[in-house]
């Protein structure tokens, strides 16, 4: 059997083995894992002499592990495994050992031994640590820990035990944590003294002999210290040993691996300080350990001081020391801010804070971002503490300037690009993203400083920015771009303090002192020569700042032409990342300064002409050599989406009130006519399904719609603009609608063309106003085709709601004409079968938009169109779909909306109220629809009981309750319109027919006639529950 298993493992792991044979071997080994006796064979395979191959032994031990952890080995058998492995350990790692196992096998044995410890240490293997410690001697009579392989294995297990029971980062169940705690208690009670003594012996005897042993031992001390008696580690003997290892930091040249020992020694101190203690004890511990001196010595050591700013600088040690500084300062601050801490302790903590401030600044300002990031948590805690003090006593804020100012200066310095950074290069993207993330974190710290001492923050930043612009004035393009970028970045952040409600001003006056400072900075920046902004990063910052603080230009209008000229240069930037971002920023700027830019409309249209040429590119056409700075800009459609901002910007500038209507038309046509010609040129190819031609027409239509958006502020969902564009302008855009419709009618099978046309339609509404209404049938015919998805239908329904809302006084006749064919397409979309979750989501959305459409018609006094002579044939289908939705147990949202529509129909067509309090707070109802009262009673009323009668209906569900409340509202509306006729019908026919008892019927009818709308909506769910309860009782009887 052993040979069979060994062969199977060899075959399964052999890359050149026959695939069929290999599959069989895999299956055999996997079956072995679940075989209750498989572990016995594998234990023998692992321990036998001569040793099997490494892969056989590794897999065999893995099977034993799996069986033990999977519960296939009982306690008695575990003792057998323990004995077998212990004998093996004594043979391989003990006094007569030869070569020990490779690291992967050692790790696997340590894992198994750790599991056996968890299972048997409490009962069955009480001598666990004695047995392992025996491996550390070369002979039983030896008094020194002199067996290197045994010591390494012992320490490997020690560290593995901590991972199993002591590591707080490991997630454990409540039972697992209880077991871990019990094992820790047992160790502390039985063996902790001898374990810590063993560490002292190992560190003493091997301090210069074997770096691997010393590093492993230090890691053990550092990990275990969090849950053992601190006195076992913090004693003179152990501290002397630790200080010896720290001494390695003073060496100029370390042998390979020695730096790991040094860093592990520092980590021990970090773990000691990280141990949970009372604030008083922690402060005393920091003082006792003399951590200030330790950190000073480490900071002044050759790797961190002598080699700083050279390629030999030891960043690993810097980060390790920074961790120690971080945890120490966090504890110092905690002692300062916690209530109940003695005055004496706080005084000591204050002294320590002053002592550690240079250490904080040293590592916070480290040129390596990883080191700086390590101390950000303690800086954040410190600033949070100072902010809390300043809130309680603002007078103290100035006293802390000695702490705040150096930290602020360090923050500002760290926000600067370092000398080695290469902005925008493809292979630097990860570094750039990490630096921007660091800037965000630093920005938060800077805000905290501003909240503690605003004046100090304003003065420091103002001085830095002013100095930078003065240097720029003197040195011009010779200035280091990193300095200018830093000043601009600080200006951008400064707005968090200066801007209120999106502006620097309140009633023409600066918001506050910060706004005054920022206005001064803006003047310096805008009056600088843009040619001095030689770097793309500073050019982008310039534009971002102009856009963010556009309110500045409302009060300095004389500067606008110069800024626009600068932007028009930058929108032609050779680097695509800058160019495409500048297109968006240009649109933002002119939108915010619309009232001041009309006088340069012609200049802008001419300057942007070359950028308004549309060239659609299929993915395969994008040139591989086309240099772009980020993934977003590698895609041609992303560039086109940015290009659209230019079309909107042109529309904004050309449509300002200072541009006469005839000039508006002239400028618009200068942009429109090339697009019309392009559409005409590509239409025939597009009809022949040429993909590039279709995409070109999609782009053309999107550009037309975006230009229209620039010409009108109107957005779907809002009322029509107070003043539409001049008739001449609307006439020009009527050509846009016509060109779009011609393309749509020819290419309506294309999803892309339909998408673009729907976008254009939504934007043309604001420019054409009611002129668009006669075209509605053509839009519907093109946008709702046989191939249109439910999503497209839902989106168009939403647009139509907005058209109805905007033009309710003018749309009736057109709506009357198009309603039947339009709704028939919607009904077809609803009826189509669904395949998969996405389809079901789209169907639910379409149902809701259909109901929303009906509500829009009814709410805008257009309900007559649904019951007009022309649309009479589909009335029954409209009602039946709503009835069907009201009974949908799987979609409460739609069911609730269905009842809302029925209530609105009832209040609209049911005639005047015969009972006070009409539902929905509706205005005067339309003329009653003959026979509709009886129709409501016989068709609508029973629906209120249909959904809750479904077996799976849960009346306690929150959404279900909302549906019932809406159904109750419908019943109250029917009663308001029909009065006693409805009560009689309920009493004599509907309720008895459902099996409702006479007493409950009278209660229901009485409540309906007595309660108002709100009261009955609350009553109906309760009544329904009582009714179902009575039915259950009758069935049981």
UniProtKB/Swiss-Prot annotation:
Signal peptide: none annotated. Gene3D superfamilies: Leucine-rich Repeat Variant. One of its GO terms (cellular component) is cytoplasm. It comes from the Eukaryota. GO terms for molecular function: small GTPase binding; tRNA binding. It is found in: Nucleus; Cytoplasm. Keywords: Cytoplasm, Nucleus, RNA-binding, Transport, tRNA processing, tRNA-binding. One of its GO terms (biological process) is tRNA processing. Pfam families: Exportin-T, Xpo1. Its main location: nucleus. InterPro entries: ARM-like, ARM-type_fold, Exportin-1/Importin-b-like, Exportin-T_C, XPOT. PANTHER family: EXPORTIN-T, EXPORTIN-T/LOS1. Belongs to the exportin family. tRNA nucleus export receptor which facilitates tRNA translocation across the nuclear pore complex. Involved in pre-tRNA splicing, probably by affecting the interaction of pre-tRNA with splicing endonuclease. This is Exportin-T. It comes from Neosartorya fischeri (strain ATCC 1020 / DSM 3700 / CBS 544.65 / FGSC A1164 / JCM 1740 / NRRL 181 / WB 181) (Aspergillus fischerianus).
């Amino acid at each position: 059997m052993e040979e069979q298993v060994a062969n199977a493992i060899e075959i399964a792991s052999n890359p050149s083995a026959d695939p069929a044979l290999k599959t069989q071997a895999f299956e055999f080994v996997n079956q072995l894992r679940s075989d209750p006796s498989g572990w016995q064979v594998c234990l023998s395979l692992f321990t036998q002499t001569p040793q099997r191959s490494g892969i056989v032994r590794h897999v065999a031990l893995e099977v034993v592990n799996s069986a033990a952890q999977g519960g296939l080995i009982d306690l008695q058998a575990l003792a057998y495994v323990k004995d077998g492995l212990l004998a093996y350990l004594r043979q391989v790692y003990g006094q007569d050992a030869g070569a020990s196992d490779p690291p992967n096998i050692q790790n696997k044995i340590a894992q198994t031994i750790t599991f056996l410890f968890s299972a048997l240490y409490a009962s069955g293997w009480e001598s666990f640590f004695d047995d392992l410690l025996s491996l550390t001697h070369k002979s039983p009579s030896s008094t020194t820990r002199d067996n290197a392989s045994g010591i390494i294995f012992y320490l490997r297990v020690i560290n593995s035990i901590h991972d199993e029971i002591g590591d707080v980062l490991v997630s454990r169940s409540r039972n697992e944590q209880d077991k871990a705690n019990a094992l820790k208690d047992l160790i502390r009670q039985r063996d902790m003294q001898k374990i810590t003594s063993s560490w002292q012996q190992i560190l003493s005897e091997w301090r210069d002999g074997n770096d691997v042993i010393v590093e492993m031992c230090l890691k053990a001390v550092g990990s275990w210290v969090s849950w053992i008696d601190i006195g076992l580690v913090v004693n003179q003997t152990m501290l002397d040993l630790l200080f010896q290892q720290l001494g390695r930091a003073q060496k100029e040249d370390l042998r390979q691996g020695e730096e790991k020992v040094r860093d592990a020694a520092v980590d021990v101190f970090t773990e000691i300080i990280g141990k949970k203690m009372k604030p008083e004890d922690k402060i005393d511990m920091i003082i006792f350990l003399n951590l200030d001196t330790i950190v000073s010595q480490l900071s002044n050591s050759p790797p961190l001081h002598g080699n700083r700013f050279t390629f030999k600088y030891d960043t690993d040690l810097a980060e390790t020391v920074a961790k120690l500084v971080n945890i120490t300062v966090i504890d110092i601050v905690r002692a300062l801010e916690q209530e109940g801490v003695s005055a004496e302790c706080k005084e000591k903590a204050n002294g320590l804070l002053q002592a550690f401030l240079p250490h904080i600044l040293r590592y916070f300002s480290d040129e390596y971002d990883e080191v700086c990031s390590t101390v950000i948590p303690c800086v954040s805690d410190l600033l949070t503490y100072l902010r809390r003090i300043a809130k309680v006593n603002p007078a103290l804020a100035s006293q802390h300037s000695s702490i705040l100012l150096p930290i602020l200066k360090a923050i500002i310095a760290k926000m600067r690009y370092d000398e080695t950074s290469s902005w925008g290069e493809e292979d630097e993207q990860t570094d750039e993203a990490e630096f921007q993330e660091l800037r965000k974190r630093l920005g938060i710290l800077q805000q905290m400083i501003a909240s503690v001492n605003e004046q100090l923050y304003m003065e420091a930043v103002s001085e830095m920015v002013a100095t930078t612009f003065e240097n720029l004035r003197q040195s011009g393009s010779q200035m280091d771009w990193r300095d200018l970028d830093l000043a601009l970045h600080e200006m951008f952040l400064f707005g968090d303090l200066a801007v209120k409600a999106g502006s620097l001003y309140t009633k023409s006056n600066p918001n506050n002192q910060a706004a005054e400072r920022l206005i001064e900075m803006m003047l310096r920046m805008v009056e600088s020569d843009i040619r001095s902004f030689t770097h793309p990063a500073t050019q982008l910052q310039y534009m971002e700042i102009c856009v963010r603080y556009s309110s500045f230009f409302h009060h300095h209008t004389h500067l606008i032409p110069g800024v626009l000229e600068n932007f028009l240069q930058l929108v032609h930037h050779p680097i695509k990342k800058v160019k495409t971002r500048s297109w968006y920023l240009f649109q933002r700027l002119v939108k915010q300064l619309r009232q001041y830019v009309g006088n340069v409309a012609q200049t802008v249209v001419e300057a942007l002409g070359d950028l308004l040429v549309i060239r659609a590119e299929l993915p395969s056409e994008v040139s591989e050599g086309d240099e772009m700075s980020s993934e977003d800009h590698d895609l041609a459609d992303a560039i086109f989406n940015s290009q659209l901002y230019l079309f909107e910007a042109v529309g904004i500038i050309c449509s300002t009130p200072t541009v006469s209507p005839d000039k508006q038309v002239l400028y618009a046509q200068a942009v429109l006519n090339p697009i019309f010609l392009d559409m005409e040129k590509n239409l025939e190819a597009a009809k022949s399904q040429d993909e590039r031609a279709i995409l070109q027409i999609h782009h053309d239509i999107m550009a037309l719609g975006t230009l229209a958006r620039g010409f009108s502020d109107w957005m779907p969902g809002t009322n029509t603009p107070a003043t539409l564009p001049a008739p001449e302008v609307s006439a020009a855009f009527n050509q846009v609608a016509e060109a779009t419709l011609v393309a749509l009618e020819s290419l309506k099978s294309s999803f892309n063309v339909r998408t673009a046309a729907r976008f254009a339609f939504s934007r043309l509404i604001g420019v054409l106003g009611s002129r668009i209404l006669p075209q509605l049938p053509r839009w519907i015919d093109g946008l709702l085709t046989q191939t249109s998805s439910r999503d497209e239908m839902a989106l168009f329904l939403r647009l139509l709601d907005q058209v109805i809302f905007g033009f309710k006084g003018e749309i009736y006749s057109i709506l009357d004409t198009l309603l039947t064919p339009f709704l028939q397409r919607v009904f077809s979309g609803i009826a189509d079968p669904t395949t998969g979750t996405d389809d079901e989501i789209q169907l639910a959305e379409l149902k809701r938009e259909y109901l929303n459409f009906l509500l829009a018609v009814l709410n805008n006094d257009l309900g007559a169109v649904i019951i007009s002579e022309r649309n009479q044939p589909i009335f029954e289908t409209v009602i039946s779909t709503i009835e069907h939705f009201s009974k949908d147990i799987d979609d409460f949202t739609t069911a609730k909306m269905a009842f809302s529509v029925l209530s609105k129909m009832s209040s609209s067509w049911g005639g005047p109220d015969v009972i006070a309090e009409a539902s929905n707070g509706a205005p005067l109802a339309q003329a009653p629809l003959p026979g509709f009262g009886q129709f409501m009673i016989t068709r609508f009323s029973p629906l209120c009981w249909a959904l809750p009668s479904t077996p799976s209906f849960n009346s306690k569900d929150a959404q279900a309750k909302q549906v019932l409340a809406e159904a109750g509202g419908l019943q109250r509306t029917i009663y308001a319109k029909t009065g006693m006729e409805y009560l009689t019908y309920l009493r004599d026919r509907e309720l008895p027919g459902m099996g409702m008892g006479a007493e409950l019927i009278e209660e229901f009818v009485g409540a309906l006639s007595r309660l108002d709308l709100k009261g009955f909506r609350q009553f109906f769910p309760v009544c329904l529950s009582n009714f179902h309860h009575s039915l259950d009782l009758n069935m049981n009887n």
